[in-house]
């Protein structure tokens, strides 16, 4: 069985003319294909969204959206295991072929101009939603990596608004990703001052500013829970928004670093 979706994507692009940056509305084509085999669910995408985006490049995100070659497969019949796998790169793929990459490549670095860098203290990883300017995230909670890849860090607002179903995509272990507005994670912000690392209150700048207390056991620490009797992941309005760990066997295709 094979599904092929070719959807027109309207994106804002920017060009530089005589030193002035101007914006124009350009029409690009989103190409996304999902194929089912006996045991795998595979995706092909050119990385272009099927909805409007923010303006890129810009001061807070100097990268331009460009075509990508995304070719990934996950298990068609995922199984939940007893321990989870921490995700620091690609977590999943949306139903329009755009990847979910909730983490950043930034860590606390007191010697860096913005107090964080790629070579900082790995014990304190930056959460994009805790940063001023959010590294240029647009209204879809997405921005562009150095390689031109447009990717989601949170709820893909325009994609969700175009659909009347809760299914948003698939995780790297094959489980479904859903969004239901009332779902809340069991993660909360710590109180008081940090005992080490960056000086100051726990304010959400770093992922380590949060801890998991559970939410009446509805969602686990990976934002996973039951929907109609089956285990799925949820995107939530509160931290971590997009799951940072997975409870199934993660496909090797999702271990590749994409920035």
Predicted regions and their residues:
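Sec-dependent signal peptide recognition
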Residues: 2-10
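Hydrophobic h-region of N-terminal signal peptides that target proteins for export
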Residues: 9-18
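Solvent-exposed N-terminal domain segments of exported/luminal and surface proteins
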Residues: 21-134
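Extracellular structured ligand-interaction cores
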Residues: 69-71, 90, 137, 147-151, ...
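Extracellular/lumenal glycan-associated surfaces
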Residues: 95-101, 146-160, 227-240
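Short, flexible domain-boundary/linker segments around small modular repeats
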Residues: 104-141, 186-221
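Short helix-loop boundary/capping segments
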Residues: 153-203
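Long, compositionally biased interface segments
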Residues: 200-259
């Amino acid at each position: 069985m094979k599904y092929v979706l070719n959807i027109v994507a309207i994106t804002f692009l920017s060009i530089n003319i005589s030193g002035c940056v101007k914006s124009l509305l350009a029409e690009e084509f989103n190409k996304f294909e999902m194929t089912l085999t006996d045991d795998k669910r595979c995706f092909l995408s050119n990385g272009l969204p099927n909805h409007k985006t923010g303006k890129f490049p810009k001061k807070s995100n100097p990268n331009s959206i460009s075509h990508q070659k995304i070719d990934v497969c996950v298990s068609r019949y995922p199984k939940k295991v007893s321990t989870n796998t921490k995700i620091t790169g690609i977590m999943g793929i949306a139903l329009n072929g755009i990847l979910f990459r909730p983490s950043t490549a930034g860590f606390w670095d007191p010697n860096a101009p913005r107090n964080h860098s790629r070579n900082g203290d790995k014990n304190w990883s930056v959460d994009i939603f805790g940063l001023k300017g959010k590294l240029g995230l647009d209204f879809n909670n997405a921005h562009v990596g150095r390689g031109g890849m447009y990717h989601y860090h949170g709820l893909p607002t325009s994609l969700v608004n175009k659909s009347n179903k809760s299914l948003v995509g698939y995780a790297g272990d094959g489980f479904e990703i859903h969004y239901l507005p009332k779902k809340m994670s069991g993660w909360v912000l710590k109180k008081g001052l940090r005992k080490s690392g960056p000086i100051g209150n726990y304010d959400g700048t770093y992922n380590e500013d949060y801890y998991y207390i559970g939410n009446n056991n509805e969602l686990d620490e990976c934002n996973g829970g039951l929907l109609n009797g089956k285990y799925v992941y949820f995107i939530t309005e509160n931290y971590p928004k997009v799951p940072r760990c997975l409870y199934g066997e993660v496909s090797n295709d999702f271990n590749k670093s994409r920035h």
